[in-house]
């Protein structure tokens, strides 16, 4: 099956050569997502909860554009800049995954913009 590019309506163009998501063989791959506005500026500086909510809402739009839901998410890669934000990020994360949680990993690292606190990349398997 060929790959389909997934770009939700109203999405901003990434600054690098990638798209928000791709769909192939019923699997949605969502690119690393940060809390950016339409001009690729970081939103909610110093607010890990608001950034996490924005990131997960953006991811949800990509998955829904592909025909899935957040319940289809099977794996998340989470990158955070400071472990002090871990509990706040998990609080919001749990709102988006209230039932069975997807597998994931979380690492502390630097991100592409200094005000970014969290980045998440996602894989979802859409039921056929």
Swiss-Prot record:
Alphabetized Pfam families for the sequence: Ribonuc_L-PSP
InterPro entries reported in the protein's UniProt record: RidA_CS, RutC, RutC-like_sf, YjgF/YER057c/UK114
One of the record's GO cellular component terms: cytosol
SUPFAM superfamilies, A to Z: YjgF-like (SSF55298)
Cross-referenced CDD domains: YjgF_YER057c_UK114_family
Enzyme class: hydrolase
Function field: Involved in pyrimidine catabolism. Catalyzes the deamination of 3-aminoacrylate to malonic semialdehyde, a reaction that can also occur spontaneously. RutC may facilitate the reaction and modulate the metabolic fitness, rather than catalyzing essential functions.
Similarity comment text for this entry: Belongs to the RutC family.
Protein name: 3-aminoacrylate deaminase RutC
Organism: Escherichia coli O17:K52:H18 (strain UMN026 / ExPEC)
Source species taxonomy: Bacteria, Pseudomonadati, Pseudomonadota, Gammaproteobacteria, Enterobacterales
